[in-house]
């Protein structure tokens, strides 16, 4: 198993450079509604950008989110289904898909373009679960070291209770499993709308200081106003 220390040091250094680690003031959390608040105008724009199938994908996605929100089922069933449904999006590296090395797509961009990488899957699952009623405190987008891939990776961790072992939603597998069963993943840091946690250090500041997150939120706001 690769040592965690070098990866953790690099992650902490990056967060320090971004101003995340430290006693930062809490920022307003992101409102619910981004995931299904897709207007006809936005669908038209993304159809022009990503092709005629974009509209079909976005309409189907909105229908699914609305119907799933009203459907009965256990918490675990919801996690399994959301993980499986969004994993159907094709995996595409950022450089090939967006022409950038590290681009965090909005859920509407990922769905309409039918392309995502690990961050994009995680972001889409996060916003969809939040819209379906999952409390923000239970959700953490989590950077890990993937032992299998030997590279950085992102997953969504779901905490049924504050002191509970998290369940892992991963684009690499449809099955949702407890973190203790994912020995192939070494956690580095995690965040949600409200806070950042660095492994072995605990709470470390506000996610608004993470550049890619701030850029993503700005694009989500523009989508909502379209």
Predicted regions and their residues:
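Bacterial N-terminal signal peptides
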Residues: 9-19
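Bacterial N-terminal signal peptides that target proteins for export
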Residues: 1-11
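A structural boundary/capping signal
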Residues: 21-226
